[in-house]
């Protein structure tokens, strides 16, 4: 009578036009898939936002010198004499006055109270030397003033200020036995440094009785071969046992580790929800077929084939899944995109970042929804195509 394609189109249009008469079954299928897509997008946007923050940290022309074998600043250590050897090594750029562009630094963990949680969390307190400001990409003092060397004063990153109490410029905050004055707030283009507090490295040494020691030496290298030249010079020096990193690569590697951990925790949850969404779609489509059994039987009796009937039912499931996916993605976009949070990074301090719901992520969410709709619609489609026409018509 009709070609199978024409029959499928006609049946699919009929099925979709009847959806307003079946709001319950449609809502069950869509809500389950929307929940799946929302959680899926939420997990991925968390990992994406963290990676964006970490990947935006660091400069290709800045080298980090850590003790050999150290994968984080916390487990690195230099004496003051070793830091001076590094400071004057070949391959390091010099400023207009001929001084090496180097900042020997300390990375310390202190506790601050979260604004939303009201509980203490680890925050990075970094001691820097005067050159440390200029070595940071996109550094800008946004409010107040920089700390005065030799005093117990801090400048705080925008992210740290937004997440923790007591970090407004002009306020004082106590870490251990020492009270610090917050003198200003800085920005670094949304990088991980905005989660830190900065002070004079010599004051930090004194406050925690750390002696004349440092954990990392940050240096701007001289030209494209500067880092290689620095690495070779330090490797040949018997007084040192160090690794030389590109600052950008160092933070990029840290981002991969933490993002993988987030995905490893979140994706199994998404998979479990996906299984639940498949069953929700199955139930909804079976209920739809049961409610329209006589209608489908009549269509079969007047000449519509089994294959177009099955395909039209499958298309209905996919359309419902698509609508649920769009709904879930929309909820994720409006609720999570740009949402600020913090997590414990490999440095054992809180890193503040914004969730990033990207177009690529939304596309992956829609694809996941369509897969669920396809899987959830196969068996109901087969049932619709194989139902006994005579049995259904007897009920008329």
Tell me what each language-model feature is.
Residues 1-38:
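N-terminal Sec/SRP start-transfer signal
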Residues 38-124, 143-145, 150, 229-236, ...:
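Hydrophobic, regular-secondary-structure patches
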Residues 46, 50-53, 189, 223-279, ...:
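Peri-transmembrane interface segments
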């Amino acid at each position: 009578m009709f070609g199978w394609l024409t029959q499928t189109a006609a049946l699919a249009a009929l099925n979709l036009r009847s959806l307003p008469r079946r709001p319950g079954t449609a809502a069950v299928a869509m809500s389950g898939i929307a929940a799946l897509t929302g959680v899926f997008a939420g997990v991925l946007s968390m990992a994406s936002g963290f990676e964006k923050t970490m990947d935006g940290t660091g400069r290709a022309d800045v080298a980090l010198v850590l003790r050999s074998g150290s994968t984080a600043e916390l487990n690195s250590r230099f004496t003051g004499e070793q830091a001076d050897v590094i400071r004057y090594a070949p391959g390091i750029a010099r400023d207009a006055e001929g001084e090496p562009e180097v900042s020997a630094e300390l990375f310390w963990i202190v506790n601050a109270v979260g604004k939303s949680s009201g509980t203490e969390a680890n925050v990075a307190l970094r001691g820097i030397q005067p050159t440390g400001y200029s070595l940071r990409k996109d550094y800008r003092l946004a409010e107040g003033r920089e700390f005065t060397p030799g005093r117990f004063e801090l400048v705080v990153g925008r992210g740290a200020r937004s997440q923790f109490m007591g970090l407004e410029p002009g306020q004082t905050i106590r870490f251990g036995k020492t009270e610090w004055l917050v003198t200003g707030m800085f920005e670094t283009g949304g990088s991980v440094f905005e989660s830190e507090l900065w002070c004079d490295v010599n004051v930090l040494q004194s406050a925690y009785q750390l002696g004349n020691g440092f954990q990392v030496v940050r240096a701007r290298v001289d030209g494209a071969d500067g880092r290689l030249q620095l690495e070779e010079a330090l490797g040949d020096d018997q007084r040192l046992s160090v690794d030389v990193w590109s600052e950008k690569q160092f933070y990029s590697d840290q981002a991969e580790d933490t993002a993988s951990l987030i995905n490893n925790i979140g994706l199994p949850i998404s998979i479990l929800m996906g299984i639940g969404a498949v069953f929700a779609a199955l139930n909804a489509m079976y209920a739809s077929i049961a409610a329209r059994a006589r209608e489908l039987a009549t269509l079969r009796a007047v000449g519509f084939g089994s294959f177009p009937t099955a395909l039209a039912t499958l298309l209905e499931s996919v359309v419902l899944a698509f609508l649920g996916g769009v709904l879930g993605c929309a909820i994720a976009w409006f609720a999570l995109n740009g949402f600020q949070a913090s997590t414990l990074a490999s440095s054992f301090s809180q890193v503040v970042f914004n969730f990033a719901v990207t177009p690529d992520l939304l596309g992956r969410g829609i694809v996941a929804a369509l897969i669920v709709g396809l899987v959830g619609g196969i068996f109901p489609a087969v049932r619709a195509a194989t139902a006994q026409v005579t049995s259904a018509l007897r009920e008329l």
